Amino acid sequence: MYKLLILIDGISNSGGTDRVASTLSSLLSNHNYDVTLYSLNSGEPYYPVDNKVSIRQPKSSMRLFKLFEFIRYAKNTRPDGVMIISMGKLSVQALLLSKLFRVKSRLICCDHVSIETFSAAVRKLKVFCYGLAEKVVVLTQHDKNYLTSAFSLKNVYVVGNISPFHHENSLNRFDDVFARKQNRVLAVGRLTYQKNFGRLLDIWKNVHKQGWKLLIVGDGEEKAELLEKIKKYHLEESAEIVSPSKKISEYYRSSGVIAMTSRYEGLPMVLIEAKNYALPAIAFDCKTGPAEIIKDDGYVVDYQSNELFTAQLNQLIASEQLRKNFAQAAWQNSADYGPELILKKWNDILN
């Protein structure tokens, strides 16, 4: 049996990367992989993890010492492969230390954010570290094309994220799912600079709402600022922010549109998950992800144009038939992120 050690920053957070790590480790553990999920930060898993997966956490409190503990664990247990799932910083640290301390396992780097979001100096450092890995797995074809053309990397592969809600399609009929939709625009994510929800509120104040409401699900350092903006724009009756919930599926199930105004992404789980609930999508064309996820099931909007985003959101609100057409396409396209296809790609990479 293939022994796989997966390193992540934390398993107790509600972010998309944490969701991916939990879902992927559970999937692999049920398909002839002996999986250990090593979380640098302590805490109980926020998302479900299969009981076949062994969960390890360091005892140290300082990050550097936590990384040293991980390296020692990797050297002692000698897994066939070490997979680093990272938002950027962790992959650099873990790859450098793994080579410095001569970890013998195959090193597989999985970065969940576009390298183009970093400065030129950081890009060079990351590309150097990518060269230390046997394989580099990115989330989009755009990222692979950039790394192979700009830096001539040969060890780059593309594997998308698995939707944790893929079972919804087999359990329900599309017409029943669509019938449960309410007049709500849903946005999900951390209330941070990256997710750019302030811009969504700037847009929402100009939308012809026709009884629709905006629901933002998330927590973070910008919450007070966003609440103040809701008050400033007099949106108290049409916009609301609620804390993250493990029952996020209920929000997906009952909403009519999913919206995203992020400054940058990797391959946003929110847009992938929304497909399983037949949600039409509207998102800015940020790097990277929306343009590869949204096909014939929504709008990808020029990043510079709030006006176009507003106009196309108005179209979605005004036309139930348009929403139904997009919803049907999203329902069908969700198969692209099902476990069978993603598992095959990982089998090819790991074996």
Curated annotation (Swiss-Prot):
GO terms for biological process: carbohydrate derivative metabolic process; polysaccharide biosynthetic process. Gene3D superfamilies: Glycogen Phosphorylase B. Pfam families: Glycos_transf_1 (PF00534). The keyword Glycoprotein does not apply. Pathway: Glycan metabolism; exopolysaccharide biosynthesis. Keywords: Exopolysaccharide synthesis, Glycosyltransferase, Transferase, Virulence. GO terms for molecular function: glycosyltransferase activity. InterPro entries: Glyco_trans_1. Its EC number is 2.4.-.-. PANTHER family: GLYCOSYLTRANSFERASE (PTHR12526:SF630). Belongs to the glycosyltransferase group 1 family. Glycosyltransferase 4 subfamily. Involved in the biosynthesis of amylovoran which functions as a virulence factor. May be involved in the formation of galactose alpha-1,6 linkages in amylovoran. This is Amylovoran biosynthesis glycosyltransferase AmsD. It comes from Erwinia amylovora (Fire blight bacteria).
